[in-house]
């Protein structure tokens, strides 16, 4: 178990928000086999609400130059060790640098109360993931996309509608739960 400090705190400078330090396991803890085609490591970043998010970063082995990147989250109630991690690892095998993240209030990420959803905060989680990816030296900030699975598909669409840095969006979902009254 390794303590990981939030790596993207630019927006927090000058604010009264203190990032939560998360303790993340560095062992392979996924529900799917580890690929021998990608490197994996745990990372954290902070959203504008001061919540520290836990993520798994997947990078193609022997990658050269600035890569296109993808942030993946969902489905609702799931964690990055499940389907979003599998999506991220599979996309990394195809040449993308990817992160699968636990949204606020879920899994290894911070936030109280636990196991709740907030469309505003969870949309911001995607934007915080873009902040993190765009600061990585091996990422082309002009080629960043997002994938929202199931209930997070609608949140991915929300994020893409308000954040012009997102150049591609996949909503792998049967409906947009954000439009339900």
Regions found by a protein language model. Give the residues of each.
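Alpha/beta-hydrolase fold nucleophile elbow
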Residues: 137-150
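Active-site nucleophile loop of the alpha/beta-hydrolase fold
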Residues: 149-151, 170-179
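Short beta-strand element of the alpha/beta-hydrolase
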Residues: 65-75
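The serine-hydrolase catalytic nucleophile loop
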Residues: 77-89, 103
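Short glycine-enriched nucleophile-adjacent loop
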Residues: 153-164
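Alpha/beta-hydrolase active-site loop
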Residues: 116-137
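Conserved alpha/beta-hydrolase
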Residues: 90-110
């Amino acid at each position: 178990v390794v303590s990981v400090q939030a790596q993207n705190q630019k927006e927090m400078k000058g604010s009264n928000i203190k990032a939560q330090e998360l303790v993340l396991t560095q062992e392979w803890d996924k529900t799917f086999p580890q690929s021998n085609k990608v490197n994996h490591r745990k990372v954290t970043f902070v959203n504008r609400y001061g919540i520290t998010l836990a993520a798994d970063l997947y990078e193609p082995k022997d990658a050269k130059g600035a890569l296109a990147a993808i942030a993946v989250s969902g489905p609702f109630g799931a964690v990055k060790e499940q389907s979003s991690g599998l999506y991220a690892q599979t996309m990394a095998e195809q040449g993308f640098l990817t992160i699968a993240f636990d949204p606020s209030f879920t899994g290894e990420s911070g936030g109280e109360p636990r196991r709740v959803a907030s469309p505003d905060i969870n949309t911001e989680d995607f934007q915080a993931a873009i902040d993190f990816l765009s600061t990585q030296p091996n990422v082309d900030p002009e080629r960043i996309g997002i994938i929202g699975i199931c209930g997070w598909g609608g949140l991915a669409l929300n994020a893409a509608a308000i954040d012009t840095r997102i150049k591609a969006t996949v909503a792998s979902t049967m409906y947009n739960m954000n439009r339900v009254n």
